[in-house]
UniProtKB/Swiss-Prot annotation:
One Pfam family from the record: Ribosomal_L6
Highest taxon listed in the record's lineage: Bacteria
InterPro entries: Ribosomal_uL6-like, Ribosomal_uL6-like_a/b-dom_sf, Ribosomal_uL6_a/b-dom, Ribosomal_uL6_bac-type, Ribosomal_uL6_CS
Protein name according to UniProt: Large ribosomal subunit protein uL6
PROSITE patterns: RIBOSOMAL_L6_1
Task of the protein: This protein binds to the 23S rRNA, and is important in its secondary structure. It is located near the subunit interface in the base of the L7/L12 stalk, and near the tRNA binding site of the peptidyltransferase center.
Entries under SUPFAM superfamilies matching the protein: Ribosomal protein L6
Keywords: Ribonucleoprotein, Ribosomal protein, RNA-binding, rRNA-binding
Species per Swiss-Prot/TrEMBL record: Clostridium botulinum (strain Alaska E43 / Type E3)
UniProt-listed PANTHER family: 60S/50S RIBOSOMAL PROTEIN L6/L9, LARGE RIBOSOMAL SUBUNIT PROTEIN UL6M
GO molecular function, one term: rRNA binding
Entry-linked Gene3D superfamilies: Ribosomal protein L6, alpha-beta domain
UniProt lineage: Bacteria, Bacillati, Bacillota, Clostridia, Eubacteriales
Name of the encoding gene: rplF
Length: 180
């Protein structure tokens, strides 16, 4: 039995989980609604404010899908209840971010400002000029949006300049030693 998959998912008050016969899972909560189609071989049941995920056999593919499906549904339940957020820091001289309406505009040392439109269900916040918070209810979209922002200036190992996640540790390298 999958160590992740065998655990039931507790459904908090105020959240409804529905599963159609073709494994379309809908989770509604105070922050919104998420719909995801799960693999047809995995059995999903909602009983007594718990979601129980079971697999039909012990084939390797079914074992893998068992834990994955349970984790995806759990992420949906947490997302509509609490939401997800990722914090990015801009490190470098002149690197800064600001909001123009819903659009994120960043100065990253290019000849032009970088403008990023939020995808559906994602919002940006800039509590400081060098800090960007990506918020949303879908964990996958929040991570993808944060990764899209980060790829504009990946942190470099010599000075540590670039866009990094809040608790990310950049492995630093020593520069060349000059001749004497």
């Amino acid at each position: 039995m999958s160590r992740v998959g065998r655990l039931p998912i507790a459904v908090p008050a105020g959240i409804t989980v529905t599963v159609t016969p073709d494994n379309v899972v809908t989770v509604k909560g105070p922050k919104g609604e998420l719909v995801k189609t799960m693999h047809k071989d995995i059995n999903i049941a909602v009983e007594n404010n718990e979601v129980i995920v079971t697999r039909p056999s012990d084939q390797k593919a079914h074992r893998a899908l068992h834990g994955l499906t349970r984790a995806l549904i759990n992420n949906m339940v947490i997302g509509v209840n609490e939401g997800y957020q990722k914090t990015l820091e801009l490190v470098g001289v002149g690197y800064r971010a600001q909001l123009q309406g819903k659009k994120l505009v960043m100065n990253l040392g290019y000849s032009h400002p970088v403008e990023i439109e939020p995808i559906d269900g994602i919002t940006f916040e800039t509590p400081a000029a060098t800090k960007v918070i990506v918020k949303g209810i879908d964990k996958e979209k929040v991570g993808a949006a944060a990764a899209d922002i980060r790829k504009w200036r990946l942190p470099e190992p010599y000075k540590g300049k670039g866009i990094k996640f809040e608790n990310e540790v950049i492995r630093r390298k020593e520069g060349k030693t000059g001749k004497k």
